[in-house]
C-alpha cells in the first residue's frame, strides 16, 4: 500500500479542493493592478490570453507574459543529440523552434511584450507536431511589429563565500527592414555556488575521528552573443538564420582544514579551471511544395571544453611531503544536423513526414599527473582518458493528426532510428542499433472547462559520450572507469493529464506518469574492482505532479494569486551488487512549492513570497552510498515597482530561512556488498542569503 506523507496529503487535498470550484466569468476594472486575473477566452478548444489579461503584471517581454499564464508549466527542450521530436511545450506563431540556441523560450525573452498578439493554450494532440503531450503554449507575434529593444541588469550577491556577480543581464534589439527582420542580442547569465562549514568523519563503528572546516565557491560567467535573421518571401516562403557565440569561464575552489582526534592537522586544496566556448549556426527555410510545405533545417555546433583540476594534500603538522593529483581534459565536441519536415493536409487529416541525420563527436585528450616530493606534477600513464567517440544517427517519423469529433483529437506518430556508434581509437567494430519509436496522443474536452489528455510513447534515450572514457572524481577520491559497451536506454511511457479551468478562480492541472525503462543508465562493476557508468536491465518510474494557480480576488484579496505545485515519484531498479530493489540514484522524488504574488491596486507596487521543497534519492555507487540535499527547503521574497523612470525594478532575497548544504556519505573499503565500512561523513554547511537586484526596461 502506498502511503503519502502529511505534506503530500495536504498538497493533494488543496489541489482536489480546486477541482470542485465552479468556473465563473471575470470582471474588468480600469486599474491594471486591480484588473481581473488572466482568464482565457475559450475558442475552439483553445484558451486564449491577450495583452489585457497581463496588464497588472506590466510585462516587458513575451516570456514575462507566458510565465503568468495560470496553471501552465513551461518545459524546456531536452538537451539531447540531434533535434528529433519536439519536447519544448512552447511554439511561436504555431511553429516549433527547432534549434540548438535556446529554442522558443530563449527567443521569447528577446521579444518585447507589446509585439505579442495573443497566447493560446492548446492540446498537443490537436497539433501536427510529434513529441508533445498535454498543454502547449502558442505565442502569436504581431505581423507589423515595431523596432524596439529590451534590457535587463541583474546583479546578485551572496552573504558568504562567493564573489558577487556584477556583470549580469541582457540587451536585445529587434527591428525590420523590408522583408528582413532581425534580433541582435548579448547577455551574460552567470552562476554562483558557495557553501562552507564543518564536516565530521566517523570510523566504521561511529566513532568521531576527524573534523574539517571546508569552503567551496564556484563562479560561472557565460557571455552569449547572438544574431537572428528572418526573411519573409518570396511568396509564402520563410527563412531564418541564427548565429551564436558563447565564451564561458568557470573557476572552482574547494579548500578544507582537517583536525584529527590525534591532534594532527592536515589540509586539502582543489582548484579547477574551465575556460571554453561554444558556437552555433542554425538555419531553416520553409516553402510551399506540391500539396503541402517543406521545411529544411540545418544545425552546426562546436564546443571547446578545456578542464584542469589540481588536488594538493598537505600534512601541516608532521612536515611530510605534500601529495597531489592533476587531471586535465581537453575536449572538443561537434554536432551537425540535417533535417527535413514535409507536412500537408488531406481533408481533416494533418500529415507530416520527417527525416533527420545527425553526426556527433567527442574528441578528448585526458592527462593524469602525480605530485612528486619536489612539488612538481609528473605525468603518469592514463591511456583510458584519451579517445574519440562518434555517432551517426538517422531518424524517420510519420505523424498523423485528426480531430475525431469537436471534443476529441488524435495524433499518431511512428518511425525508427538507426544509430552507428563508434569508439574510433579502439579495435572494436562499429556498433549498430535499430530502435523503433512512436507515440499515440489523445486529447478530450468532455465539457467546458475540462481538458484531458493521454499519451503512450516508445522513447529512445541517449548516452553521454564522456562515459566512454575515464573521468576520475578527485574531490571524492573515486575512480570512474570508461565503458565502451554502453547502449542507449529505451522506455515505454504512459502520461495522462487532467486540466480544469476554474474561471476567475484560476486553473488546476494533475499529471500522472508511468515509465518502464530498459537498459537504464547507472553505475556498474567494471573489471575486477572498478566501477563506471553502464546499463542495468530495467527500471520503473511512476508518479504525479499537481500544478495550480488560485486567484484570490474572489476571496476579497484584489490583485493577489497563489501558485501551488506538489509532486511525487516512486522508482525501482535492481541493485547490480545485491540484486535487491532500490530507488534509481539521484532522482528527485518529492517536491512542493507555494508562491503568493500581490499586485497592490492603485499603485505600481507588487510583492511576492515563496517556499520550495526538493528531496532526492540517495546516490548508489559500488564503493559508497551518499545523499546530497543542497538547500532542501528554500524560501524567498521580492518587492517590485513596475514604473521607476519607465523601468521595472525588483529587489529579491532568497534563502531567507538559512537552508543548509547537507551531505551524508557511507564509504566502504571495497565493494559495499562484501567489505566493511571505511568511514561515515556528515556535512551541514552554511550557504546564507542571496540578494538580487533586477532592472528591466524597453527602448
What are these model-predicted stretches?
Residues 96-123, 171:
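Short acidic/polar hinge/loop motifs at secondary-structure boundaries
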Residues 38, 46, 63-100, 124, ...:
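Extracytoplasmic beta-strand/coil segments of soluble accessory domains associated
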Residues 28, 615, 641-699:
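C-terminal beta-signal and adjacent terminal beta-strands/loops
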Residues 161-196, 207-254, 273-293, 438-440:
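Transmembrane beta-barrel wall of Gram-negative outer-membrane proteins
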Residues 62-65, 106-107, 131-155, 167-169:
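N-terminal periplasmic accessory domains that precede
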Residues 226-248, 272-429, 433-435, 443-445, ...:
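Face-selective signature of the C-terminal outer-membrane beta-barrel domain
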Residues 270-278, 331, 389, 431, ...:
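Outer-membrane beta-barrel signature, preferentially recognizing the C-terminal barrel domain
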Residues 513-516, 535-621:
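Gram-negative outer-membrane beta-barrel transporters
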